[in-house]
Amino acid sequence: MTRTVLLRALTKNKFVASNAPRSISISITSLSRCISTLILAEHESGTIKPQTVSTVVAANSLGESSSISLLLAGSGSSLQEAASQAASCHPSVSEVLVADSDKFEYSLAEPWAKLVDFVRQQGDYSHILASSSSFGKNILPRVAALLDVSPITDVVKILGSDQFIRPIYAGNALCTVRYTGAGPCMLTIRSTSFPVTPITANSESKKATVSQIDLSNFEDDSVSKSRYVGRSTQDTERPDLGSARVVITGGRALKSVENFKMIEKLAEKLGGAVGATRAAVDAGYVPNDLQVGQTGKIVAPELYMAFGVSGAIQHLAGIKDSKVIVAVNKDADAPIFQVADYGLVGDLFEVIPELLEKLPEKK
Protein backbone atom coordinates (compact mmCIF):
# COMPACT_ATOMS: atom_id res chain seq x y z
CA MET A 1 0.00 0.00 0.00
CA THR A 2 2.79 2.44 0.95
CA ARG A 3 4.72 1.64 -2.25
CA THR A 4 1.59 2.26 -4.38
CA VAL A 5 0.99 5.65 -2.74
CA LEU A 6 4.64 6.62 -3.24
CA LEU A 7 4.57 5.66 -6.93
CA ARG A 8 1.40 7.66 -7.46
CA ALA A 9 2.98 10.66 -5.75
CA LEU A 10 6.07 10.43 -7.94
CA THR A 11 4.13 10.15 -11.19
CA LYS A 12 1.50 12.71 -10.34
CA ASN A 13 3.79 15.76 -10.46
CA LYS A 14 5.80 16.89 -13.46
CA PHE A 15 9.19 18.53 -13.47
CA VAL A 16 8.96 22.26 -13.95
CA ALA A 17 11.86 24.24 -15.36
CA SER A 18 12.17 27.98 -15.04
CA ASN A 19 14.62 30.43 -16.57
CA ALA A 20 13.43 33.33 -14.44
CA PRO A 21 16.23 35.69 -13.30
CA ARG A 22 17.39 35.13 -9.77
CA SER A 23 16.67 38.66 -8.58
CA ILE A 24 13.01 39.09 -9.65
CA SER A 25 9.86 38.03 -7.82
CA ILE A 26 8.79 34.55 -8.92
CA SER A 27 6.24 31.96 -7.92
CA ILE A 28 7.51 28.85 -6.16
CA THR A 29 7.59 25.70 -8.28
CA SER A 30 8.00 22.10 -7.27
CA LEU A 31 10.99 20.09 -8.39
CA SER A 32 9.13 16.91 -7.39
CA ARG A 33 12.10 15.32 -5.65
CA CYS A 34 11.59 12.35 -3.38
CA ILE A 35 12.82 14.39 -0.41
CA SER A 36 12.30 18.13 -0.48
CA THR A 37 12.74 19.97 2.81
CA LEU A 38 11.48 23.38 3.89
CA ILE A 39 13.21 24.90 6.92
CA LEU A 40 11.71 27.80 8.87
CA ALA A 41 14.67 30.12 9.33
CA GLU A 42 15.18 32.32 12.37
CA HIS A 43 16.95 35.62 11.93
CA GLU A 44 17.58 38.76 13.92
CA SER A 45 19.21 42.07 12.98
CA GLY A 46 20.11 40.76 9.54
CA THR A 47 21.79 37.61 10.84
CA ILE A 48 20.76 33.97 10.60
CA LYS A 49 20.62 32.32 14.03
CA PRO A 50 22.94 29.34 14.67
CA GLN A 51 20.06 26.97 15.43
CA THR A 52 18.82 27.40 11.86
CA VAL A 53 22.17 26.20 10.49
CA SER A 54 22.02 23.23 12.88
CA THR A 55 18.59 22.43 11.45
CA VAL A 56 20.14 22.41 7.96
CA VAL A 57 22.73 19.92 9.21
CA ALA A 58 19.89 17.74 10.50
CA ALA A 59 18.05 17.98 7.18
CA ASN A 60 21.12 16.58 5.44
CA SER A 61 20.51 13.29 7.24
CA LEU A 62 17.12 12.81 5.60
CA GLY A 63 18.66 11.49 2.39
CA GLU A 64 21.43 12.04 -0.11
CA SER A 65 19.09 13.45 -2.77
CA SER A 66 17.39 15.85 -0.36
CA SER A 67 16.90 19.44 -1.53
CA ILE A 68 16.79 22.07 1.19
CA SER A 69 14.98 25.42 1.05
CA LEU A 70 15.10 28.09 3.75
CA LEU A 71 12.02 30.21 4.39
CA LEU A 72 12.61 33.71 5.76
CA ALA A 73 9.86 36.17 6.59
CA GLY A 74 9.89 39.71 7.84
CA SER A 75 10.21 43.19 6.41
CA GLY A 76 12.79 45.81 5.64
CA SER A 77 16.49 45.81 4.85
CA SER A 78 17.44 43.49 7.71
CA LEU A 79 15.38 40.71 6.10
CA GLN A 80 17.26 41.06 2.82
CA GLU A 81 20.58 41.06 4.69
CA ALA A 82 19.58 37.86 6.45
CA ALA A 83 18.53 36.32 3.13
CA SER A 84 21.90 37.13 1.60
CA GLN A 85 23.66 35.49 4.54
CA ALA A 86 21.32 32.49 4.43
CA ALA A 87 22.27 31.85 0.80
CA SER A 88 25.80 30.98 1.88
CA CYS A 89 25.22 29.72 5.43
CA HIS A 90 25.63 26.07 4.39
CA PRO A 91 26.53 24.32 1.11
CA SER A 92 23.45 22.09 1.33
CA VAL A 93 20.99 24.97 1.01
CA SER A 94 19.73 25.10 -2.58
CA GLU A 95 17.18 27.91 -2.30
CA VAL A 96 16.25 30.77 -0.02
CA LEU A 97 12.61 31.88 -0.11
CA VAL A 98 11.91 35.39 1.15
CA ALA A 99 8.48 36.69 2.23
CA ASP A 100 8.81 40.46 2.59
CA SER A 101 5.69 41.97 4.13
CA ASP A 102 4.66 44.04 7.14
CA LYS A 103 2.47 41.08 8.15
CA PHE A 104 5.65 39.23 9.16
CA GLU A 105 7.44 42.12 10.86
CA TYR A 106 6.97 40.28 14.15
CA SER A 107 7.14 36.51 14.48
CA LEU A 108 3.48 35.98 15.28
CA ALA A 109 2.42 32.38 14.91
CA GLU A 110 -0.85 32.90 13.01
CA PRO A 111 0.44 34.71 9.89
CA TRP A 112 3.59 32.56 9.90
CA ALA A 113 1.52 29.36 9.92
CA LYS A 114 -0.57 30.63 7.00
CA LEU A 115 2.62 31.51 5.13
CA VAL A 116 4.13 28.05 5.61
CA ASP A 117 0.93 26.45 4.34
CA PHE A 118 0.93 28.85 1.36
CA VAL A 119 4.54 27.99 0.48
CA ARG A 120 3.96 24.27 0.99
CA GLN A 121 1.07 24.22 -1.47
CA GLN A 122 3.30 25.66 -4.17
CA GLY A 123 6.45 23.77 -3.29
CA ASP A 124 5.08 20.29 -2.45
CA TYR A 125 7.61 19.65 0.34
CA SER A 126 7.96 16.22 1.89
CA HIS A 127 9.45 17.56 5.15
CA ILE A 128 9.02 20.81 7.10
CA LEU A 129 11.60 21.49 9.81
CA ALA A 130 12.18 24.09 12.51
CA SER A 131 14.47 24.40 15.47
CA SER A 132 13.19 23.33 18.90
CA SER A 133 13.30 26.96 20.01
CA SER A 134 10.41 29.10 21.19
CA PHE A 135 10.08 30.25 17.56
CA GLY A 136 9.77 26.73 16.15
CA LYS A 137 7.63 25.39 18.97
CA ASN A 138 5.25 28.30 18.53
CA ILE A 139 4.78 28.05 14.77
CA LEU A 140 5.17 24.42 13.72
CA PRO A 141 2.28 22.99 15.81
CA ARG A 142 -0.06 25.55 14.24
CA VAL A 143 1.05 24.53 10.77
CA ALA A 144 0.55 20.88 11.73
CA ALA A 145 -2.99 21.68 12.87
CA LEU A 146 -3.74 23.37 9.54
CA LEU A 147 -2.54 20.28 7.66
CA ASP A 148 -4.00 17.76 10.13
CA VAL A 149 -0.68 15.99 10.74
CA SER A 150 1.18 15.13 13.93
CA PRO A 151 4.57 16.82 14.36
CA ILE A 152 7.55 14.99 15.86
CA THR A 153 9.27 17.20 18.41
CA ASP A 154 12.76 17.49 19.89
CA VAL A 155 14.45 15.20 17.37
CA VAL A 156 18.03 14.39 18.42
CA LYS A 157 18.91 11.90 15.68
CA ILE A 158 17.67 11.16 12.17
CA LEU A 159 17.83 7.54 11.03
CA GLY A 160 16.15 8.08 7.67
CA SER A 161 13.49 10.08 5.90
CA ASP A 162 10.74 8.66 8.14
CA GLN A 163 12.52 7.40 11.25
CA PHE A 164 13.72 9.59 14.10
CA ILE A 165 14.95 9.47 17.70
CA ARG A 166 13.64 11.82 20.38
CA PRO A 167 14.09 11.89 24.17
CA ILE A 168 11.30 10.95 26.57
CA TYR A 169 10.95 10.82 30.37
CA ALA A 170 13.02 13.99 30.88
CA GLY A 171 15.81 12.66 28.72
CA ASN A 172 16.21 9.41 30.64
CA ALA A 173 15.15 7.33 27.64
CA LEU A 174 15.26 7.63 23.87
CA CYS A 175 12.29 6.75 21.69
CA THR A 176 12.49 5.74 18.02
CA VAL A 177 9.56 7.16 16.06
CA ARG A 178 8.46 6.27 12.53
CA TYR A 179 6.33 8.74 10.60
CA THR A 180 3.50 7.11 8.65
CA GLY A 181 1.29 10.11 7.90
CA ALA A 182 0.08 11.12 4.45
CA GLY A 183 0.98 14.80 4.78
CA PRO A 184 4.43 16.36 5.05
CA CYS A 185 6.61 15.13 7.89
CA MET A 186 7.05 17.94 10.42
CA LEU A 187 9.98 17.99 12.83
CA THR A 188 11.40 20.28 15.47
CA ILE A 189 15.15 19.76 15.79
CA ARG A 190 17.17 19.98 18.98
CA SER A 191 20.03 22.06 17.62
CA THR A 192 22.55 20.99 20.25
CA SER A 193 22.42 17.45 18.85
CA PHE A 194 23.49 18.61 15.37
CA PRO A 195 26.70 20.63 15.73
CA VAL A 196 27.78 22.75 12.79
CA THR A 197 31.16 21.97 11.26
CA PRO A 198 33.09 25.19 10.54
CA ILE A 199 33.03 26.00 6.83
CA THR A 200 35.98 27.67 5.14
CA ALA A 201 35.14 31.07 3.76
CA ASN A 202 35.03 30.34 0.04
CA SER A 203 31.99 32.55 -0.13
CA GLU A 204 31.23 32.90 -3.83
CA SER A 205 31.80 29.27 -4.79
CA LYS A 206 28.54 27.95 -3.34
CA LYS A 207 25.59 30.27 -2.95
CA ALA A 208 21.92 29.36 -3.02
CA THR A 209 19.34 31.10 -5.19
CA VAL A 210 17.41 33.84 -3.39
CA SER A 211 13.77 34.12 -4.54
CA GLN A 212 11.21 36.68 -3.45
CA ILE A 213 7.87 34.97 -2.81
CA ASP A 214 4.96 36.39 -4.78
CA LEU A 215 2.43 37.26 -2.05
CA SER A 216 -0.22 38.72 -4.36
CA ASN A 217 -2.43 35.65 -3.81
CA PHE A 218 -1.59 35.27 -0.13
CA GLU A 219 -4.70 35.66 2.00
CA ASP A 220 -4.26 35.98 5.73
CA ASP A 221 -7.39 36.20 7.86
CA SER A 222 -5.48 35.66 11.10
CA VAL A 223 -4.01 39.13 11.60
CA SER A 224 -6.92 40.23 13.78
CA LYS A 225 -6.62 37.19 16.05
CA SER A 226 -3.43 38.39 17.70
CA ARG A 227 -1.41 41.57 17.76
CA TYR A 228 2.10 42.53 18.70
CA VAL A 229 2.19 44.33 22.05
CA GLY A 230 5.89 44.70 22.77
CA ARG A 231 9.18 43.01 23.42
CA SER A 232 11.35 43.22 26.52
CA THR A 233 15.06 42.50 26.29
CA GLN A 234 17.97 42.71 28.66
CA ASP A 235 20.82 45.02 27.72
CA THR A 236 23.89 42.88 28.24
CA GLU A 237 27.16 42.17 26.50
CA ARG A 238 26.98 38.52 27.49
CA PRO A 239 26.43 35.95 24.73
CA ASP A 240 23.07 34.30 24.10
CA LEU A 241 22.41 31.45 26.52
CA GLY A 242 21.41 28.97 23.83
CA SER A 243 24.61 29.37 21.78
CA ALA A 244 27.23 30.42 24.36
CA ARG A 245 30.54 28.52 24.56
CA VAL A 246 30.61 29.02 28.36
CA VAL A 247 27.57 28.87 30.65
CA ILE A 248 27.65 29.66 34.38
CA THR A 249 24.54 28.46 36.22
CA GLY A 250 23.34 29.10 39.74
CA GLY A 251 20.77 27.26 41.81
CA ARG A 252 18.47 28.03 44.71
CA ALA A 253 21.42 27.66 47.10
CA LEU A 254 22.44 31.23 46.21
CA LYS A 255 19.51 32.30 48.40
CA SER A 256 18.91 35.82 47.03
CA VAL A 257 18.98 38.16 44.06
CA GLU A 258 22.03 39.93 45.48
CA ASN A 259 23.97 36.69 45.87
CA PHE A 260 23.11 35.67 42.32
CA LYS A 261 25.12 38.65 41.10
CA MET A 262 28.22 36.60 41.92
CA ILE A 263 27.22 34.24 39.11
CA GLU A 264 26.85 37.22 36.77
CA LYS A 265 30.30 38.57 37.71
CA LEU A 266 31.88 35.16 37.13
CA ALA A 267 30.16 34.88 33.75
CA GLU A 268 31.49 38.30 32.75
CA LYS A 269 35.04 37.31 33.66
CA LEU A 270 34.80 34.09 31.65
CA GLY A 271 32.95 35.68 28.73
CA GLY A 272 30.03 33.33 29.28
CA ALA A 273 26.25 33.36 29.59
CA VAL A 274 24.27 33.19 32.82
CA GLY A 275 21.90 30.30 33.48
CA ALA A 276 19.67 29.28 36.35
CA THR A 277 17.75 26.29 37.62
CA ARG A 278 13.97 26.28 37.74
CA ALA A 279 14.13 26.57 41.53
CA ALA A 280 16.19 29.76 41.25
CA VAL A 281 13.79 31.18 38.67
CA ASP A 282 10.74 30.28 40.77
CA ALA A 283 12.39 31.96 43.75
CA GLY A 284 12.63 35.17 41.72
CA TYR A 285 16.42 35.43 41.59
CA VAL A 286 16.49 35.80 37.78
CA PRO A 287 13.95 36.03 34.93
CA ASN A 288 12.66 32.79 33.42
CA ASP A 289 14.44 33.32 30.09
CA LEU A 290 17.64 32.25 31.88
CA GLN A 291 16.22 28.89 32.95
CA VAL A 292 18.27 25.89 31.82
CA GLY A 293 16.65 22.47 31.57
CA GLN A 294 13.93 20.49 29.89
CA THR A 295 11.37 23.26 30.38
CA GLY A 296 13.90 26.02 29.71
CA LYS A 297 16.89 26.37 27.39
CA ILE A 298 18.74 23.30 26.11
CA VAL A 299 22.46 24.13 26.12
CA ALA A 300 25.61 22.43 24.87
CA PRO A 301 28.54 24.74 25.69
CA GLU A 302 32.23 23.89 25.72
CA LEU A 303 32.21 24.57 29.47
CA TYR A 304 29.22 24.34 31.82
CA MET A 305 29.72 25.38 35.45
CA ALA A 306 27.00 24.72 38.03
CA PHE A 307 27.04 26.33 41.48
CA GLY A 308 24.55 25.20 44.09
CA VAL A 309 22.76 23.00 41.56
CA SER A 310 21.56 19.68 42.94
CA GLY A 311 20.88 18.11 39.55
CA ALA A 312 17.18 17.41 39.03
CA ILE A 313 16.56 15.14 36.04
CA GLN A 314 14.81 17.95 34.16
CA HIS A 315 17.90 20.13 34.55
CA LEU A 316 20.30 17.34 33.59
CA ALA A 317 18.25 16.72 30.43
CA GLY A 318 19.06 20.26 29.34
CA ILE A 319 22.83 20.09 29.85
CA LYS A 320 23.73 16.53 28.88
CA ASP A 321 25.37 17.57 25.58
CA SER A 322 27.81 19.96 27.30
CA LYS A 323 31.44 19.14 26.52
CA VAL A 324 32.78 19.71 30.07
CA ILE A 325 30.61 19.97 33.18
CA VAL A 326 32.00 21.43 36.42
CA ALA A 327 29.88 21.22 39.58
CA VAL A 328 30.28 22.88 42.98
CA ASN A 329 27.93 21.78 45.76
CA LYS A 330 28.09 21.25 49.52
CA ASP A 331 26.20 17.97 49.22
CA ALA A 332 28.58 15.19 48.17
CA ASP A 333 25.58 13.03 47.18
CA ALA A 334 24.04 15.61 44.83
CA PRO A 335 22.99 13.99 41.51
CA ILE A 336 24.91 16.66 39.56
CA PHE A 337 28.17 14.91 40.51
CA GLN A 338 27.07 11.79 38.61
CA VAL A 339 27.30 13.65 35.29
CA ALA A 340 30.03 16.17 36.13
CA ASP A 341 33.49 15.83 34.61
CA TYR A 342 34.93 17.81 37.52
CA GLY A 343 33.30 18.16 40.92
CA LEU A 344 34.13 20.13 44.05
CA VAL A 345 32.37 19.51 47.35
CA GLY A 346 32.45 22.92 48.93
CA ASP A 347 30.62 26.10 49.87
CA LEU A 348 29.88 28.20 46.79
CA PHE A 349 30.09 31.36 48.94
CA GLU A 350 33.75 30.55 49.48
CA VAL A 351 34.55 29.10 46.05
CA ILE A 352 33.10 31.85 43.84
CA PRO A 353 34.83 34.81 45.58
CA GLU A 354 38.14 32.95 45.34
CA LEU A 355 37.58 32.32 41.63
CA LEU A 356 36.70 35.97 41.07
CA GLU A 357 39.88 37.03 42.83
CA LYS A 358 42.17 34.73 40.85
CA LEU A 359 40.62 34.99 37.40
CA PRO A 360 41.95 37.84 35.23
CA GLU A 361 39.59 40.44 33.83
CA LYS A 362 38.14 39.53 30.43
CA LYS A 363 39.88 41.50 27.69
UniProtKB/Swiss-Prot annotation:
One of its GO terms (cellular component) is mitochondrial matrix. It is found in: Mitochondrion matrix. Its main location: mitochondrion. SMART domains: ETF. CDD domains: ETF_alpha (cd01715). One of its GO terms (molecular function) is electron transfer activity. Its cofactor is FAD. Belongs to the ETF alpha-subunit/FixB family. This is Electron transfer flavoprotein subunit alpha, mitochondrial.
